[in-house]
Amino acid sequence: MFIIIKSTEKKQYVNFAHGGFTMEYRIKKIQSKADIDLCNEFEITNYKWRNVYTPKVVGKMGFIPGEGIFAKMTCFEENPLALKTQDRDRVCDDSAMEIFLAFTEEGEKLSNDIMYINFEFNSNAKMYAKYGKGRKGRTFISEELCKECGCTVTKDEKSWTATVLFPIKFLEETCNAGKLDVGSQFYCNFYKISETPEIEHYGSFSPIGTETPNFHVPIYFAKAIIVE
């Protein structure tokens, strides 16, 4: 069953096939990172489970041929918790934003055991980034790849903005994305989180239908489509 919600920037589809709510995000093809503000905006509005507060988060994502998928996210919060200072640290204990991308191989059905990437970053621009099929036995990206992703953060008094690149070679060769171009489809979700009790919160772009906190559920991801 699908219900279309009209929008000036993107179409959203309600899909109850998996007992969840699936939306659609259109990833614009752009020429460079400088064009990211031309892309469609998404907003994290679905907060559930335990939330001490619910910060506003918006973002944009674009496809750069030959480079990869570039994303920009802004969280409107003052003095974000940022105790983690090394890549691979559990930044979800800080105030963190996250991007998950999932890919099915030809003939493979959507499930929670498909290939997906989780890039998680705090306002120190430190990343906890893994890939793999399903939640167990996931692999950290290499230090070299982490540098190539180039996570950066800028801050002001009321917000912080992160940018990150998902390199095309990593997506196409390691993550089963196939050759990416206009018309390519996969799955995505965007998150805001802290697991520290004093500021605990769990926000997502595409709603999640689990009873307990769990972002590792591709069946609830939004459909992503690369467009002109």
Predicted regions and their residues:
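An acidic-aromatic pocket/loop used at catalytic or ligand-binding sites
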Residues: 12
